[in-house]
């Protein structure tokens, strides 16, 4: 068996090797569960522990990614082969949900959370980083690579990809568009490994487009982690190292700059960002 085959067999998708390999009943049940959960959550407005106001001041439910989690749980209950791969993603879900429930915007970015720690305060954002780091280590270890550099580059890809999607989740559909686009940049085989989330996010997306729910840290970190796991299974070693370096650069840049402002100054990116939801509201470009 070649190295590529061994890696592929070890990582085997977070969700399945090919979309067509997922039993149709499992796929339908998972998508239905995601859509139903999103529909129920969308009726809550700003009520409950996950109630918030969005960037336009409208009532909204955060942690909409729980709808995707619900779909994964249903799929795992119906197909035992999916459970180990789904389990790898749950540290990211737990860390994100913790921040969605009790986190505050007082501290932002790595600098903000580390600065709070130096003052003796442990923020939920710092706990989220801890859960994400643990999840990334677990995901990288599942590949069984004996090479230390490759192990740490894989860990960085998964952890930083999860956090990057967290940074993107500031406008409706932005993180979902980035996820769909990035998934299709990978090989067709790798797109298949993301099939459950690719399809499961479709019914959810309608509610996010109407500003009833947002992914929150729960959903953004889930999508980013799933994409990161897929990337370290699909890309060669050099590609993974380059991706890790690119993610580091993006995070350093994002510590000092606004992603939303960057998009707003570029007409093409602004149009892509507004597509799918701007017809429902007047988009605002400031954070």
Language model features: what each stretch is:
Residues 4-8, 16-17:
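Acidic, Ala/Val/Gly-enriched low-complexity intrinsically disordered segments
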Residues 15-257:
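"…together with the soluble PPM/PP2C metallo-phosphatase catalytic core" -> "…together
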Residues 65, 247-287:
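Membrane-proximal soluble regions of multi-pass membrane proteins
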